[in-house]
């Protein structure tokens, strides 16, 4: 088996609004959308600097729904950018909720975390140093040992 691509495909309650948010917060560009006669968006694609994010409105009749407010989500979308502080600020200004301010992390990245208005969690980071897996494990173990 050969995997050619892997896409995140998010379900949101209002895809049109999500497209506007992702454009404002992350500079995403709409590639296409498929709209039902009712106005519900069955599929949309956004370009994030060469990476595609897929979106669709909820289809509860098929068990397809987005995260519920206050219920959390088991998935975090990680976006690697040039300046995490700037992008976190843009996301919050666009309507995201700040979950964690950007800070330098043991794994060689400066990163922060936001939750978008549709319940999806985004980790936003940029590289600050190259860290080998062995050094990363050492730092992780050391960090966990601190009270």
Q: Where on the chain are the PLM-derived regions?
A:
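Short acidic-aromatic low-complexity motifs
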Residues: 12-16
């Amino acid at each position: 088996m050969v995997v050619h691509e892997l896409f995140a495909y998010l379900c949101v309650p209002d895809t049109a609004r999500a497209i506007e948010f992702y454009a404002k917060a992350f500079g995403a560009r709409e590639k296409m959308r498929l709209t039902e006669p009712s106005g519900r968006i069955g599929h949309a694609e956004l370009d994030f600097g060469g990476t595609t994010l897929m979106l669709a409105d909820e289809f509860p009749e098929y068990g397809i729904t987005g995260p519920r407010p206050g219920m959390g989500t088991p998935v975090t979308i990680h976006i690697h950018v040039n300046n995490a502080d700037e992008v976190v600020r843009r996301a919050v200004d666009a309507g995201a909720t700040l979950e964690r301010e950007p800070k330098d992390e043991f794994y060689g990245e400066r990163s922060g975390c936001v939750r978008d208005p549709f319940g999806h969690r985004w980790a936003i980071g940029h590289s600050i140093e190259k860290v080998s897996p062995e050094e990363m494990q050492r730092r992780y173990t050391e960090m966990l040992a601190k009270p």
